[in-house]
């Protein structure tokens, strides 16, 4: 009888321990889409997975590549993904329609957008006005091209004098190299790496950043599905915190970050991702604004100006407010977003 009681007690204790363990290790599933392929600019998210930052927050994150920085909006709107990376300026235009889901950005990844026009130096295209009379290749789904109208307005270009050819992502840089177009619209680091990897020297490549000619826009941001955001605010908060930790870790340990990329993207190589990583960190991620205010910082006055600027080339029917587009309620404290001195002074 004593043995039976002892055995029952042991079984009860084991069962309780099992329940306790399953509760302790319960993970909230999160479906997350990147804006593009597994490449260095998004390495912080991959590092957060590989180094267990999401897991430590109780999140089970599924990470998928994307099809362009506009498509992420559709993925979140449909509910097929809880979170996605996308161009915040395209979100501004999307939210102009009150019938569309109330998607918001919860983390600004790209403080300075990579939107650019790339050409060969020999073409003589040195300023935006030089694009008049030229043939420009641009994928319709590209985030940079999505902001073309705002760019030509800000830069004083006569859009009627620029011929645009809709090209696919895979043939964009090859068409430039073959001389089939005079210039291409893209994220600068994508075209730079493609052309450099094809053997072109830095001095042969000309990049016109749209932001240098009057465009005050932000770039890619993390967007949240409204239903998921409302039902799982803590999961969103934890995801943002772990992601910022991932980007700071990637900045401190670039080789680890690039290794995280290459394990998911065997088609790329270390040299290409090292170039892409450096260009992204130097030109798009660590701006003066971020060094001063921390990763993920958004200047509300600047965002308001960007909404106004988009409206100069896009006719609003229901102009969105800042609160329709972005919220900082999911950001961790400033101390967790601060840029360490060693990174702030670093040239990648």
Feature annotation, model-predicted:
Residues 303-348:
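Conserved C-terminal helix/tail region of periplasmic/extracytoplasmic solute-binding proteins
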Residues 159-163, 202-206, 267-278, 316-325:
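Short, surface-exposed acidic
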Residues 20-23:
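N-terminal signal peptide c-region/cleavage motif recognized by signal peptidases
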Residues 6-10:
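N-terminal export leaders
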Residues 1-5:
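N-terminal secretory signal peptides that target proteins for export/translocation
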Residues 26-178, 182-189, 208-210, 215-216:
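Short, glycine-/small- and polar/acidic-enriched structural segments
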Residues 170-174, 180-270:
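Pocket-lining segment of extracytoplasmic ligand-binding domains
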Residues 231-315:
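Secondary-structure end/capping motifs
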């Amino acid at each position: 009888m004593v043995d039976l009681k002892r055995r029952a007690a042991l079984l009860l204790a084991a069962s309780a321990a099992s329940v306790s363990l399953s509760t302790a290790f319960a993970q909230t599933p999160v479906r997350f889409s990147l804006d593009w392929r597994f490449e260095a600019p998004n390495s912080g998210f991959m590092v957060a997975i590989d180094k267990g930052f999401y897991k430590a927050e109780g999140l089970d994150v599924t990470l998928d590549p994307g099809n362009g920085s506009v498509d992420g909006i559709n993925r979140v709107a449909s509910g097929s993904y809880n979170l996605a990376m996308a161009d915040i300026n395209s979100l501004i235009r999307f939210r102009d329609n009150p019938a569309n889901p109330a998607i918001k950005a919860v983390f600004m990844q790209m403080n300075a957008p990579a939107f650019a026009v790339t050409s060969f130096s020999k073409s003589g295209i040195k300023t935006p006005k030089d694009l008049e009379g030229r043939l420009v290749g641009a994928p319709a789904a590209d985030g940079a091209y999505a902001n073309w109208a705002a760019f030509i307005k800000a830069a004083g270009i006569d859009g009627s004098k620029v011929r645009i050819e809709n090209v696919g992502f895979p043939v964009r840089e090859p068409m430039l190299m073959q001389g089939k177009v005079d210039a291409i619209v893209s994220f600068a680091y994508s075209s730079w790496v493609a052309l450099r990897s094809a053997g072109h020297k830095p001095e042969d490549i000309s990049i016109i950043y749209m932001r240098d000619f009057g465009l005050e826009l932000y770039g890619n941001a993390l967007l949240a599905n409204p239903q998921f955001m409302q039902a799982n605010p803590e999961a969103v908060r934890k995801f943002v915190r772990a992601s910022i930790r991932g980007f700071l870790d990637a900045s401190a340990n670039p080789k680890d970050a690039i290794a995280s990329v290459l394990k998911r993207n065997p088609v790329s190589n270390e040299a290409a991702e090292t170039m892409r990583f450096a260009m992204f960190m130097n030109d798009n991620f660590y701006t003066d604004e971020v060094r001063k205010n921390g990763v993920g910082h958004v200047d509300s006055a600047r965002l308001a100006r960007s909404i106004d600027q988009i409206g100069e080339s896009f006719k609003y029917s229901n102009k969105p407010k800042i609160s329709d587009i972005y919220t900082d309620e999911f950001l961790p404290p400033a101390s967790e977003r601060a840029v360490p001195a060693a990174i702030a002074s670093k040239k990648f």
